[in-house]
Amino acid sequence: KVIDEKNVILFIDEIHNIVKAGGAEGAIDCSNIIKPYLSRGEIQIIGATTYEEYEKVFSTDKALKRRFQIISIKENSREETLDILNVLIPIYAKYYGKNVSDGIGKFIVECADKHLPNLSFPDKAIDILDNSLALTKKDLLTFDEIKTCMKKIYHVDLDFNFNYANI
């Protein structure tokens, strides 16, 4: 159906998983099925993966590698992430039917930057906001609820005696 439509671009998240996907020993895997369609221009695909996974997996399949072009997306800065959060906080708060304390965005960015180094901005900050609002039973999301979320979801024990409002 995608081939017949001609105006469809497929998006495959974690595209590195198509190599060897569904292929038992000696069988055709997903990447080998799509290669002819890609080479003839019958389908267009955008895939997302990390640079490390791309190099690890696509480097083993030269034919597939030459059918894709790398587009690097840099991680957002702390400042850009805070700008994004400031837009999203009222939207998420309304969705969850909660209010949010002043300064929560900056606090979330600080927590994400310091305690979740293996994840990327803005995703890690948005996840903290989303998870904290989902977990809290109170009407107001405060620093304490963020601390509770960080402990419960991310297993990060923030210092409960520190005055985070001064960040």
Language-model features, listed with the residues they occupy:
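AAA+ P-loop NTPase nucleotide-binding core of proteostasis motors
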Residues: 1-167
